[in-house]
Amino acid sequence: MRLILLGAPGAGKGTQAGFIKDKYNIPQISTGDMLRAAVKAGTPLGIAAKKIMDEGGLVSDDIIIGLVKDRLKDGDCANGYLFDGFPRTIPQADAMKDAGVAIDYVLEIDVPDEAIVERMSGRRVHPASGRTYHVKFNPPKVAGRDDVTGEELIQRDDDKEETVKKRLSVYHDQTEVLVGYYNKWAESGQPGAPKYRKIAGVGPVDQIRDNAFKALEG
């Protein structure tokens, strides 16, 4: 099972990625993790990436694709792999295709923006314990207070409505084009074209999980 997960930030990709990894016994490929590992190991690509990052630059797609190809040679990728958060742009998707990175499925988790804003901006956290609440879906017994200690709950900066809306805007501008890109490729019937599947990311987590598994079996 070799797949790419697509969806806006807050669509629940991370949750579903966990279920898919466990079911198919495949690793989640994170470009951030790969970069850190390559820099730490001092590989040629890692050294090149470190030089760019130290200068405050963005690591090129060529280096990222090189890291991806190296990572896919590892033994834990024998059953496949899962990409979440990569590719983010058409040039990255083209580079993956040109490098011969095989993909069986592209799974899009579709959630309306207003549902994502409600889901993320309603989160509240008890900093000391990490306990999380939601003002609507999982409220504390006393508004704004942790159930166990009675201490104040906070809203993380990442969960503030304006931040969530900004991230969604970046997604729609830069990454949403991949939906059309992979849809078109899937419909082309070309050798090596992936199957494109879209599921709704709203509703009970277990139901979304079951729908994801069903989509990846057809």
Curated annotation (Swiss-Prot):
Positions bound to AMP: T31, R36, G57, L58, V59, G85, F86, P87, R88, Q92, R156, R167
Pathway(s) per entry: Purine metabolism; AMP biosynthesis via salvage pathway; AMP from ADP: step 1/1
Chain residue ranges for the region called NMP: 30-59
EC number: 2.7.4.3
GO CC annotation: cytoplasm
PROSITE patterns attached to this UniProt entry: ADENYLATE_KINASE
Sorted UniProt keywords: ATP-binding, Cytoplasm, Kinase, Nucleotide biosynthesis, Nucleotide-binding, Transferase
Reactions catalysed, as given in the entry: AMP + ATP = 2 ADP
GO BP annotations, alphabetical order: AMP salvage
SUPFAM superfamilies xref list: P-loop containing nucleoside triphosphate hydrolases (SSF52540)
Record GO terms (molecular function): adenylate kinase activity; ATP binding
Pfam families listed in its UniProt record: ADK (PF00406), ADK_lid (PF05191)
Family, as annotated: Belongs to the adenylate kinase family.
Entry-linked HAMAP family: Adenylate_kinase_Adk (MF_00235)
Quaternary context: Monomer.
Protein name: Adenylate kinase
Originating species: Herminiimonas arsenicoxydans
